Amino acid sequence: MAKKAPDVGDYKYGFHDEDVSIFRSERGLTENIVREISKMKEEPEWMLDFRLKALKLFYKMPMPQWGGDLSELNFDDITYYVKPSEHTQRSWDEVPEEIKRTFDKLGIPEAEQKYLAGVSAQYESEVVYHNMEKELEEKGIIFKDTDSALRENEELFKEYFASVVPAADNKFAALNSAVWSGGSFIYVPKNVKLDTPLQAYFRINSENMGQFERTLIIADEGASVNYVEGCTAPVYTTSSLHSAVVEIIVHKDAHVRYTTIQNWANNVYNLVTKRTFVHENGNMEWVDGNLGSKLTMKYPNCVLLGEGAKGSTLSIAFAGKGQVQDAGAKMIHKAPNTSSTIVSKSISKNGGKVIYRGIVHFGRKAKGARSNIECDTLILDNESTSDTIPYNEVFNDNISLEHEAKVSKVSEEQLFYLMSRGISEEEATEMIVMGFIEPFTKELPMEYAVEMNRLIKFEMEGSIG
């Protein structure tokens, strides 16, 4: 017997709580708002100057003329800063009760107790809870919310901040640079290897809210770190904006894995800039799960600066009714013997649209570089669409580039075979989809793989929205 599809109320992340903020800026983006944010955070003068210059760039820069439709995004109707509590807490008991209830529903304290070396929880514009195992601090690892790192590690912070993604990079990087708040700052010292994941969780609760976290990760020579972030928001009838910037520096022989499981509600514009600089024999892995949102535009980028540097992106995108997932990856080869891999898995149903948009660039010095790209799309009905838009730039003749793209539908033969074994059509389709995404989920820690599979099943049953 076919399972009954749950309604939106069964989507456990779709709830929203009463506004418990202690400060909320006026809607719209002005110089006064930017100054107010910087003043409330008691930032140094150079950061205020950085914000104000970024604001001017934002005003001047055009909207992207490619990708999804941004015509309904109204910058004047967004709240750019909401302060939910007075301080970041290290004890879960000290987090304000209303906020704690939200994260209890999301399972954050339980997850921390089970398998995390450190966890950070951001609610609206600020990190409300942050904790890390003491032994990691003793190894010299820094894991803080980004605002605390600016106050407490200013010299290190200033050395790397905006060095990978400058404010002038694109319009939404400029916007983030003007109003950024929260995010994670991680520094792993030379030859320190961290096996247990560090996690951050980002939650938008308010309507017409903008969340603009800024994450900065530095893996020093020979270091290793695994970072996981999760993102959710309630279901509203009006739009919210998530516009983050992620900067990562992978030094010589270092390794960083950055995993994202985002599950935004379908009223969220998710417009994110993620980039890493990878030095000699460094290794950067992006593992990127894109579910939900009204529109996602996100292309994790590896700039391979040192000889032997490696970069990889493994991503999955799922687009349902009224959703556009415009995602992909960028691999910029600037040094000899560099290598990159892009594996993109996309699923569309109920008229959803998935787009793979990628760039692979081989510079003149990138002799012996190689790249392999695989794009697989599964379309579940006749209303849904998929596009693959690769862009390759080659400036030397000693490289290797392989690109494979495949679009398929669930075949009648597959369904017939499974249904002949007593499985319903709905369950058979679900089994085919789960097999399709298995190369992605097997790369996740077990707890995240279980959660990802559960979210995909909700998408299949039409419950997320």
Swiss-Prot record:
Family recorded in the similarity comment: Belongs to the iron-sulfur cluster assembly SufBD family.
InterPro entries: Fe-S_cluster_assembly_SufBD, SUF_FeS_clus_asmbl_SufB, SUF_FeS_clus_asmbl_SufBD_core, SUF_FeS_clus_asmbl_SufBD_sf, SufBD_N
Short name of one Pfam family: SUFBD_core
Highest taxon of the lineage: Bacteria
Protein name: Iron-sulfur cluster assembly SufBD family protein SH2035
Signal peptide: none
Lineage of the species this protein comes from: Bacteria, Bacillati, Bacillota, Bacilli, Bacillales
BP GO terms, sorted: iron-sulfur cluster assembly
